[in-house]
Regions:
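Soluble, non-transmembrane catalytic domains of enzymes that act on hydrophobic metabolites at membranes
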Residues: 40-52, 104, 117-120, 139-140, ...
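Edge beta-strand at a domain terminus
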Residues: 136-153
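Short beta-strand segments that buttress and anchor functional surface loops
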Residues: 44, 109-115, 132-137
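Amphipathic/hydrophobic helical signal segments and adjacent flexible N-terminal regions
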Residues: 1-97, 153
Length: 153
């Protein structure tokens, strides 16, 4: 198991709040994600930091994200009461696309929502997991980002 995977597993298992600085330090050790590396279906989860978004996606039945191509992304794949997955375009105000964007001095794969000013930046933990930082007007919490992860299905 790589050091990145080990640290990621430790963060996932924590049930107390994780300081943004701990996640920022981990982020700095990871390699930028590529658009090709993001293609596929991913199950999502969040890091508990005390951000206003913590718990909101779970309440909506969020499963994860599906990247069919750079121009065809389902950012909010949710599960309904009968267990069926669907793209929640109402909550996401549309769907999304993937771009390469500069974030914190590195160019990395970034998902840009079609209908709202939100950008999800990704860095690679390994071939089957990425860390995400959600950034944008609608999501910043007193200047704080929302931290999450995706694991390949």
């Amino acid at each position: 198991m790589s050091l990145a995977r080990k640290k990621f597993s430790e963060f996932k298992e924590r049930d107390d709040h994780i300081a943004d600085t701990e996640l920022d330090d981990f982020w700095a050790t990871l390699q930028p994600a590529t658009i090709d590396g993001m293609i596929g279906e991913w199950k999502g989860g969040e890091f508990l930091t005390g951000h206003k978004m913590n718990g909101q996606l779970e309440k909506a039945g969020w499963f994860g994200k599906t990247f069919k191509s750079a121009s065809d992304v389902q950012p909010l794949v949710c599960v309904d009461a009968t267990g069926n997955k669907f793209s929640n375009v109402a909550m996401g105000k549309g769907e999304a696309s993937l771009w390469l964007e500069d974030f914190r001095g590195e160019v990395t794969a970034t998902m840009v929502y079609d209908g709202q000013p939100v950008h999800d930046h990704f860095k690679k933990i390994d071939d089957d997991a990425v860390m995400g930082i959600m950034n944008g007007k609608g999501v910043l919490d007193s200047g704080r980002y929302y931290y999450f992860y995706l694991e390949r299905v």
